[in-house]
């Protein structure tokens, strides 16, 4: 039974097109997102591991090693069962630092470009045999179904088709940041297809083939001797070596790394994969023994690796044969697409970009895209070249062994990355290189010699399919041994130690608190424009800011450090960790000479993420840290901790409530970024020699507040450079109570004085006034009448003085419930009252205050204030002078200035001008209580009054009144 090449080509291309349409439907959002991102899709996408070697070659493994073929499934299943301590930490590292391949991961950990180059070159030794295996399998199956064309030509045609589809599937995006969800869905689809194909074949064997001889059990009983001769006992074969190889494949094989880590969009899906993927492999392995036994029974004349296809041909079942062919095509195509994509990205990052980058004027993203496409074609053509030279003469098992043994050479470096922070680049590179050379000498060259019949004059060991595992053990053992010995005998660099902390699952990385040369995000864009071009630099910086949920402009030192780290991670996904690390270090350097210390805030943030994973003493210490942190957070007094350079490291809840600035907005920034009045107040205190300040007044929230400030110096210890702790205590209530107490005492004293004056003077004055009135009624003598008028005038004067004393004594006893007051209206009222006096007729009053000056207070008492101030200005002015009243709004206050051009006030007088009974007017023209009363009223309104004199040319006075500003625009009717 044969098929035409056209039929096979139509079937194969049709299948690949269906895969592409599935991927395209996902990218166009034709399918619900909950389907695409379901953990089951992720689990099935890991089925890319089941390549043509699993679909076809596992039957050959069963023929060689008996039940040892299960190592193919059990080795990698063991790695996924151990995912909490093996795969999950790697996933976290790759997601955090945007590492898209094993070369990226190892170059990041061992901090040398040679690590990336070496891993990339050796990965080629892994990839080429694995791709050759797929090409061989598809070429051989095509030849079995149609023997009219040479198998080499069929293999070449398959390679060309796969180059096209690999580019269509994965080389349409620039950065691995853009997940290929369509590719993941397509690989999940092909996993289902090959699982269905092999299960259907197994069912046909069980229920259609063996019933002819009484069932499978009867046939096995009859052919025990034949089966025993063709199988190897587990203890005699390479069982343990196979387990180790396939265990390492979970991380080291490029297609598994890509699907498990790079394309992972939901870290939680790895939990389902830890049991779901082993279950998938177990189900797939169930059909392998029946297929092998059916091949024996039907006497299929193909290699045991192709028994699956041979059974369909032997049964002359066209549907079964085509289903198996499509299943094998799915197995081979999936791994080819994913492997070439991941390997091309690896070579681009570590072999091309370190050597050549396009000029900034070119479209960097487009150049990356075409370079990746070219590398995909080169890798597949290299695999085809190896197939033409050697691969066609090696069976599937030999090709698979070559690839997986080479892959296991990465295992020491991976384990050191996770569990041995002291390992270093020298040990890693020495072990990897010598282990790989041992693989070449003891495995690759002997297999090539056997396949081609060459005589290679290098005294090669006699390696064959029976003892290859010894060479594999020697190569891996030498790798491990050198890795350990050289790492122990040499020291790490500082960069390696930092990377080791970032990668180790037993430690929390300790980021440093070091300022950048760039002062803001715009300067970072400018710095990166030199190597990347303006467009790419701006796009990458804005993307990093968006990832960190930061504003488009950022200048906080802590945020800039986070931005730098995020940029390095994002650029790592674009061009690899080596190039991105060098680029960031060169164009975004830290400031030289700055004192290096650990970033306590970032360390605490990371410890919070590790809290549930800590145990034992570490957990107890973390609980103690959290308790102390909570104590500081809940203190009723504001507490902030500062680094020596003024960067805020801690800002507790009370501090946030007092200042109105949240901890997230100020932590990591300099104190100078705090808004007024807090920034200037705290900076002035920090720069002073004072360790304590009591009752420091600031105006905020429309009223004055008083604060106590205290600071303490933190001495350097434990690698930390020290710093300052500042305590902020709200003393407003205490100050208000003290003011009220003093005010009450003063009023009581004045009240007693006024009462005494009224008692001692009031009654006699009343009597004198009565006597003067009696004189007016009892005489017509003009002289006596004039004398009586003078007596009454003087008694009225004394009465006014007594009334002033009484008014002063009652200052402060007015209601504290204030209304919204239009200050401009009060000034106009005061001016109108003054104009009623004859002394104001030749004085011009100019009110230049804006119409919306509002405060909370007593309108009548504020009118009294301005009557006093304007009256004093009038008394100091000459006829024809002008008195100006100016007003302005500030952040929290309104400011009113009363300016005259009078004779001014000398300095000695200014020092006593607000004291009671102090006056510069002539005797009989003032009591000295006016400005004292003004001062009391302004204090009642939480305001402030000051006098500057002279203003200019030795003349003039400016009285400034500051009152809390109110935002209300409706004014009460108290003005009337």
What role is predicted for each listed range?
Residues 812-816, 854-857, 920:
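Conserved micro-motifs of the catalytic ATP-binding
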Residues 938-939:
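Detector for a conserved hydrophobic position within an alpha-helical segment of the HATPase_c
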Residues 823, 904-912, 926:
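Short helix N-cap motif at coil->helix boundaries in the Bergerat
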Residues 697-703, 708-709, 785-813, 817-837:
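Conserved DHp (HisKA) dimerization/phosphotransfer helix of two-component histidine kinases, i.e.
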Residues 943-950:
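Conserved glycine-rich
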Residues 1-559:
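Membrane-embedded helix-loop-helix hairpins and adjacent transmembrane boundary segments
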Residues 839-854:
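Conserved catalytic submotifs in the C-terminal HATPase_c
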């Amino acid at each position: 039974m044969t098929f035409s090449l056209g039929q096979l080509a139509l079937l194969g291309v049709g299948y690949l097109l269906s895969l592409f349409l599935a991927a395209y439907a996902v990218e166009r959002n034709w399918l619900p997102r909950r389907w695409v991102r379901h953990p089951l899709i992720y689990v099935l996408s890991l089925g890319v591991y089941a390549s043509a070697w699993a679909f076809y070659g596992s039957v050959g493994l069963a023929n060689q090693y008996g039940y040892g073929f299960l190592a193919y499934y059990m080795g990698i299943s063991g790695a996924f069962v151990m995912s909490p301590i093996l795969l999950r930490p790697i996933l976290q590292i790759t997601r955090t630092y945007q590492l898209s391949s094993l070369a990226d991961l190892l170059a990041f950990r061992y901090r040398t470009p040679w690590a990336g180059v070496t891993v990339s070159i050796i990965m080629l030794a892994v990839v080429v045999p694995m791709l050759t295996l797929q090409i061989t399998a598809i070429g051989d199956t095509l030849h079995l179904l149609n023997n009219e064309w040479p198998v080499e030509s069929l293999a070449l045609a398959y390679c060309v088709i796969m180059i096209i589809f690999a580019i269509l599937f994965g080389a349409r995006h620039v950065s691995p940041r853009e997940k290929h969800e369509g590719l993941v869905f397509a690989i999940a689809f092909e996993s289902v297809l090959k699982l269905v194909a092999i299960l259907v074949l197994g069912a046909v064997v069980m229920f259609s083939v063996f019933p002819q001889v009484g069932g499978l059990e009867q046939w096995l009983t009859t052919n025990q001797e034949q089966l025993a001769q063709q199988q190897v006992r587990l203890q005699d074969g390479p069982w343990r070596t196979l387990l180790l190889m396939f265990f390492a494949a979970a991380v080291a094989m490029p297609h598994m790394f890509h699907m498990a880590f790079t394309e992972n969009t939901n870290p939680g899906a790895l939990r389902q994969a830890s049991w779901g993927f082993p279950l998938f492999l177990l189900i797939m392995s169930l059909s392998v023994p029946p297929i092998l036994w059916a091949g024996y029974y039907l006497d299929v004349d193909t290699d045991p690796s192709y028994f699956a296809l041979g059974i369909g041909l032997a049964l002359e079942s066209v549907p079964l044969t085509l289903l198996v062919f499509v299943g094998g095509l799915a197995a081979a195509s999936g791994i080819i697409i994913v492997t070439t994509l991941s390997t091309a990205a690896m070579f681009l990052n570590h072999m091309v970009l370190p050597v050549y980058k396009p000029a900034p004027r070119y479209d960097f993203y487009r150049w990356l895209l075409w370079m990746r496409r070219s590398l995909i074609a080169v890798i597949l053509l290299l695999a085809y070249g190896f197939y033409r030279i050697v691969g066609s003469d090696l069976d599937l098992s030999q090709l698979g062994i070559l690839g997986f043994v080479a892959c296991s050479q990465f295992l020491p470096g991976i384990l050191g990355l996770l569990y041995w922070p002291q390992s270093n680049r020298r040990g890693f590179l020495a072990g990897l290189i010598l282990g790989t050379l041992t693989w070449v000498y003891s495995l690759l060259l002997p297999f090539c010699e056997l396949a081609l019949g060459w005589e290679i004059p290098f005294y090669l060991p006699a390696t064959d399919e029976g003892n290859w595992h010894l060479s594999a053990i020697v190569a891996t053992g030498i790798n491990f041994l050198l890795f350990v010995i050289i790492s122990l005998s040499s020291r790490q660099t500082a960069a390696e130690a930092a990377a080791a902390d970032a990668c180790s699952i037993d430690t929390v990385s300790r980021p440093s608190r070091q300022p950048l040369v760039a002062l803001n995000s715009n300067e970072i864009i400018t710095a990166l424009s030199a190597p990347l071009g303006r467009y790419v630099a701006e796009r990458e910086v804005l993307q990093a800011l968006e990832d960190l949920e930061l504003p488009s402009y950022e200048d906080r030192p802590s945020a800039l450090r986070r931005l730098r780290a995020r940029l390095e991670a994002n650029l790592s996904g674009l061009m690899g960790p080596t190039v991105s690390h060098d680029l960031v270090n060169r164009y975004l350097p830290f400031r030289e000479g700055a004192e290096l210390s650990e970033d306590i805030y970032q360390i605490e943030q990371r410890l919070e993420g590790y809290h549930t994973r800590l145990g034992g003493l570490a957990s107890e210490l973390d609980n103690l840290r959290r308790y102390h942190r909570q104590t500081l957070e809940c203190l009723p007094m504001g507490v902030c901790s500062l680094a020596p350079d003024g960067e805020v490291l801690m800002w507790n809840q009370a501090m946030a409530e007092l200042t109105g600035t949240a901890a997230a907005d100020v932590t990591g920034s300099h104190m100078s970024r705090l808004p007024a009045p807090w920034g200037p107040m705290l900076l002035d205190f920090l720069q002073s020699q004072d360790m304590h300040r009591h009752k420091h007044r600031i105006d905020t929230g429309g009223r004055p507040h008083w604060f106590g400030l205290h600071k303490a110096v933190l001495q350097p210890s434990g690698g930390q450079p020290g710093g300052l702790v500042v305590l902020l205590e709200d003393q407003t209530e205490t100050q208000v109570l003290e003011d009220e107490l003093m005010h009450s005492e003063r009023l009581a004293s004045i009240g007693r004085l006024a009462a005494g004056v009224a008692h001692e003077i009031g009654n006699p004055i009343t009597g004198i006034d009565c006597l003067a009135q009696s004189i007016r009624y009892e005489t017509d003598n003009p002289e006596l009448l004039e004398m009586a008028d003078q007596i009454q005038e003087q008694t009225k004067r004394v009465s006014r003085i007594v009334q002033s004393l009484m008014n002063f004594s009652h200052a402060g006893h007015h209601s504290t419930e204030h209304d919204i007051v239009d200050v401009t209206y009060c000034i106009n009222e005061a001016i109108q009252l003054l104009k009623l006096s004859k002394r104001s007729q030749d004085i011009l009053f100019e009110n230049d205050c804006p119409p919306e000056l509002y405060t909370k207070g007593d309108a009548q008492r504020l009118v009294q204030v301005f009557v006093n101030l304007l009256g004093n200005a009038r008394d100091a002015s000459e006829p024809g002078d002008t008195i100006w009243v100016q007003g302005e709004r500030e952040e929290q206050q309104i400011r009113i200035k009363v300016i005259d051009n009078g004779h001014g006030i000398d300095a000695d007088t200014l020092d006593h001008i607000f004291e009671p009974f102090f006056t510069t007017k002539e005797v009989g023209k003032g009591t000295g209580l006016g400005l004292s009363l003004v001062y009391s009223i302004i204090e009642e309104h939480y305001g402030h009054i000051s006098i500057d004199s002279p203003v200019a040319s030795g003349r003039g006075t400016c009285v400034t009144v500051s009152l809390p500003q109110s935002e209300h625009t409706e004014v009460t009717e108290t003005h009337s």
